[in-house]
Amino acid sequence: MRARTAWTAAQGEPAVTLLLRHGQTPMSVQKRYAGRSDVPLTDAGVAQAAAAAKRLASAGIDAIVASPLKRTVQTAEQVAGVTGLPVVTEDGFRETDFGDWEGLTFAEVRERWPSEMTAWLADPQVAPPGGESFAEVSERVTAALHRVLAGRTGQRILIVSHVTPIKTLVAAALLAPSAALYRMHLDVAALCEIDWYADGPAVLRSFNDTAHLSN
């Protein structure tokens, strides 16, 4: 896939990615930075994943790819249970490594690292102390996407991941800068859909879709 700076009519059949954020975890309830922490789903998170799986059962999915962290694998396994597809893990779809901020709330980080937090919010090249910048996340997520989509034109692939990787893919589809991540909100167990065309253009079909959670 080549980046385009302007829209042109897409040619051929796209590879379709359905992007599913994992269900609720104890750290998402407490609004704590949860990057590499391998926390499981809560009971509510399991129910959310099951609701997403019920919706995706008839979505024509050809493959399921997930971040290797427990919360994403548990979510993906719910979909695997209704589709009969195996779950393949891809390390590139892990959440951001938040370094010294892991497990803390925004307020706690702001109190202890005020200047570092300000710099991080202003520049995607800046990483948390001991962690990973959004620019670095973008590089590995984009590389993972290329690996997953290779040879899959015309297929529908479910990618079960986290807030930052999913927002990164949305920004890439829209040709938006990394700073756009700060302008997006993504709920737990929310779905997004993107068409990726081999000749370059991408089409964002839906974002933060949680209709399955209200049924």
Segments predicted by a language model, with ranges:
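Phosphate-coordination/substrate-recognition cap region in phosphate-metabolizing enzymes
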Residues: 2-12, 51-117
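Loop-to-helix element that buttresses phosphate recognition and phosphoryl-transfer chemistry
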Residues: 24-79, 125-142
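General small-molecule cofactor/ligand-binding pocket signal
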Residues: 18, 88-90, 205
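Active-site-adjacent alpha-helix immediately C-terminal to a catalytic or transition-state-stabilizing loop
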Residues: 7, 73, 143-201
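Short, solvent-exposed aromatic-acidic interface loops
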Residues: 205-215
